[in-house]
Amino acid sequence: MPNRKVVKFFFDVISPYSYFGFEGITRHRSVWKTPIQMKPFFFAGVVRHTENPGLPLRIPIKEKYMHKDLLFSAQYWGIPFRLPKDYTNMMLNTSSIVPQRILVASQLRDNVLMEDVARGLWHRFYAYGKPIFTKSQVAEVLRDLHVKDVDELVMMSDSAEVKNILRENTDEAIGNGCFGAPWMHITDGHGKVLQTVFGSDRLPQVADFLAEPFKGPMREKKPNA
C-alpha cells in the first residue's frame, strides 16, 4: 500500500530556523516518497494568538545562546549566514506580512517559484544582512531571480485571495497547537493530523515517523548561492 501520509511545512522568512528546516525538508524530498506541502504563514499572528512572551530574543542569556546556535546550525546545513545589524530590534519590531503575502502570490503562480523566492529572501537577509520587509525590497529579490511580471506579482499580494490564504494557513497551524516556526503537521490521506512537530531539528524524528530515510544535511543538494 502506498504511503498516504503528507507533511505540511509552515514557515515564515523572518525565522532563521524556518530557513534551516526548509532546506532540510526540501533536500530530503529527493529521497522521500511522502508528499510535502509548503505553507507560508504569518509567525507574528501565531505569537499574538499564543500570547507568548518567551521569545528567546527577549531573554539576554537565551539571545546570546541563540546567536551562537544559529551560526552552528547554518554551518551544519551548509548555508551562508550572518546576523544582520540591529537583528534583535528587527526581529521584535518588524512585520513579515509583505514577504509572506508575496510568497503566497508566488505559490499561486508556481510552487517552484515560491521556493526560489523564499530562498532568495532568506539569502538576502541572512547572508547579506539586507532588509526584506517592504514591497520594493522584495521586488529587488524577484528581479534578481529574473521573475516575470514582478510588478504584477507584487500587486497580486494585496488581493483578497492571497490575504485569505495566508490567514487560513496561519489559522490551520494555530488550530493544531502551533506556537513557533517552523511548524509541521503530518496528516493521513484524509487530512487528519497524526502528529505535530516544532523545530528544524526534528527532521530525524519526522523521517522515522514516515518510515523514510534521514540523510543528514545533504549539503550536496544545497542550491547555488
From Swiss-Prot:
Subcellular location(s) of the protein: Mitochondrion
Secretion signal span: none
Protein residues bound to glutathione: S15, P16, Y17, N52, S200, D201
Listed GO CC annotations: mitochondrion; peroxisome
GO terms for biological process, alphabetical: glutathione metabolic process
Tissue: Expressed in the pharynx, body wall muscles and epidermis. Weaker expression is seen in the intestine.
Keywords: Mitochondrion, Transferase
Mutant lacking the gene: phenotype: Significant decrease in respiration rate and a lower concentration of the monounsaturated fatty acid cis-vaccenic acid.
Enzyme Commission number(s) from the entry: 2.5.1.18
Any single Pfam family the record assigns to this protein: DSBA
Reactions it catalyzes: RX + glutathione = an S-substituted glutathione + a halide anion + H(+)
Molecular function, one GO term: glutathione transferase activity
InterPro entries: DSBA-like_thioredoxin_dom (IPR001853), GST_Kappa/NadH (IPR051924), GSTK (IPR044088), HCCAis_GSTk (IPR014440), Thioredoxin-like_sf (IPR036249)
Known role: Has roles in respiratory and lipid metabolism.
Family: Belongs to the GST superfamily. Kappa family.
Name the UniProt record assigns to this protein: Glutathione s-transferase kappa 2
